[in-house]
């Protein structure tokens, strides 16, 4: 073709002699000439013209001629070129032409056209081209499937026809073959083994096959012998199946007629050739019995046999190679195989015809490359297989061995460049070995490096270059209005101050219920509530006075000691404190039940003895101070901090007159005249019966005798067990382990409410509300739980829980829980526990315990202890007398008898097991059970 542009019309005119009116090629010669022109075509126009001519050609002969001449290969070249140049129109035209050509499997195997088309169907960018390629691929797949299935079937049919002809023509040869079979009996044994394998799958049919083969083999053998004369006889000798079968038939030859009768009905179904076989079969009467049964059952199990044949395929395959080896030499072995095939046909009669599969199976294996050779090899193997096979229209599986030259098959796979590949996937063993070596090396290096790694810097630190960043164009929050709103809000709102880490707010008021809670002996710090047990007792009874008992019975000392040791809070003194405690107790009191505690208390040197024995062990903290009371501050053991360490009492004489006589209750010198007594009571006189409670101190200060106390000259009660607070007070004077937690100040919002630790707020805004210990605030509200206190500053209220106190300055109220108190200044009110009374000070009034709380910043929470007696103010406002002892004034105050779980008659409760066994109880005064002689009368 010229290098200039091509006019398709001129090209068609030049080809007019080869084309008809529709553009179709007229003859086979014309297509060969057109093919020669196509090879010279270089322009796309000419190529498209030739492709359109092929599309118009309908004659399959002409198209096949084009393929044979080399047109298919030429189209492959064009397809490859157009694919590389991505010429979509030309690709579409080529694909249409390929779809139009009658290609076969052999053609597709010649080159990689099919692979190129498949790649186009997957990776082409043009959707139409992809669809066209996928359609072409599906068409070719259908061709491959159809040819692979149809070709073997056609070959089988041809073989069957040939076998039938050979069977019908030579009936006499079987006798000669029988002789040959008698010569070689060993071969028949081998054959029998084959049927046995078949029997494994279908025993009844196996019998039928064996019988049918034996009878039919002679007829079949002669037929094939006619075709293959002497060679056939030799090969038949190799196949002694008929010999054995005939020998077997000879033994039962007497019963031949019945066998014939039985076989005739079977023969009626087969063709005339099968009838001939039936006549030959009669010599097998003995086997016929089982054979007839097999035949009768055969038609029904025929379908089942198909399944069984599938199973048999492996077993049958094993014998087939055996025969194949024997008969592989000449293709004439086919006659032997066809002869046995007729017996198999008899079996086929029972089992609706299964195609002779020996040939088909090899074709399946060889369809790709060994079709002609496979046919030859198949007949060789078929002799054994056909006998075992049935004609049911199904392929028979078998094993064949192709010739030496055809043993190798090559399959070519082209990599689709666009296909995604797993890069990490190991492709071959060599790569896997390399990877393993690298991984081992890496693991070894890391292990070695880690073993000697001292975590030291090996590379000197180099300060990185500072990055110069441009200033931000927009300042964050520059236009925010919310920040101004927040600033205005903060101007009018107090800052939230969290003085205690545990809780930022005041604790909620805890309502006290008369129901005693359950004892859960956890850590000593948080084992008990403020008012764990409440009991109502008679006020009289020296031994039964609850508070007096709680503070005057000896076992409370033991309770203090044991409490300081319990729950992992041993004394801070020597390690052997526990043993010393036991020795001290035994030396002092012997048995708690042997001597009444009051007798011990009356001993003049009893308190000194206790002090001398306890202080060296650190059980009472440091030695006595000015007034003989050890401070309960942080220096002492945690469990002993029930004496506030705050400043001295602001008012002279709240705890005893400065010049008054001091009875043996005090363990040291009298308190200094002003503020020298920062504690309510000393260790031997913790809460009830100090000079301020029961001491006869005649000084100007008021005194208050403890409930149930004896009087100023009576021996002091032992100290009660300390409360172990869980939280420290808020104001400066509070103990770290006060129990009361944070509290609001009476005056300025700061509150000190330790459970038992002392604390005196000297400042104006601190309230002191210790649970048991005293404290005095200069300008503060003092709310000790049990002990008295006095407030000097204005606006301070003294609200001891149980003990008395006097508010000296104006505006102070005295609200003892059960003890009396007088408001000395204006606005001071005395609100004792229960009974009415008149306050000597102005606007002071008595308010019973159980009434509503006192108004103001802090309400008074009643103790809920029943049995409180009212107060009578007979003497001066600051003089209150207990119900038993004489008072300075003319008035007596009768304290309540139900202790704050430090007294109380528990005799109606079960006796404490620990107390009876050990002589002490870790919960001494807080124990819910009866301690004889401590929280109730001693046992009789």
UniProtKB/Swiss-Prot annotation:
Zinc finger (C3H1-type): 906-934
PTM remark: Phosphorylated on Ser-398 by PKA within the region necessary for interaction with PPP1CA.
Comp. bias (Pro residues): 644-655, 714-723
Stretches the record annotates as Interaction with TOX4: 1-348
Record has Zinc-finger as a keyword: yes
Occurrences of domain TFIIS N-terminal (ranges): 73-147
Location in the cell: Nucleus; Chromosome
Residue ranges with Low complexity bias: 325-336, 676-690
Region Necessary for interaction with PPP1CC: start-end pairs: 393-408
Sequence positions bearing Omega-N-methylarginine: 665, 693, 739
Biased composition (Gly residues): 540-551, 565-579, 726-764, 790-845
Signal peptide residue numbers: none
Annotated segments matching region Disordered: 147-211, 247-270, 304-400, 533-905
Chain span(s) of sequence motif PP1-binding motif: 394-423
Region Necessary for interaction with PPP1CA, annotated ranges: 357-433
Entry annotated with the keyword DNA-binding: yes
Keywords: Chromosome, DNA-binding, Isopeptide bond, Metal-binding, Methylation, Nucleus, Phosphoprotein, RNA-binding, Ubl conjugation, Zinc, Zinc-finger
Free-text function comment from the UniProt entry: Substrate-recognition component of the PNUTS-PP1 protein phosphatase complex, a protein phosphatase 1 (PP1) complex that promotes RNA polymerase II transcription pause-release, allowing transcription elongation. Promoter-proximal pausing by RNA polymerase II is a transcription halt following transcription initiation but prior to elongation, which acts as a checkpoint to control that transcripts are favorably configured for transcriptional elongation.
Domain notes: The TFIIS N-terminal domain specifically recognizes disordered sequences in protein substrates that are then dephosphorylated by PPP1CA (or PPP1CB or PPP1CC).
Protein name: Serine/threonine-protein phosphatase 1 regulatory subunit 10
Species, as recorded: Macaca mulatta
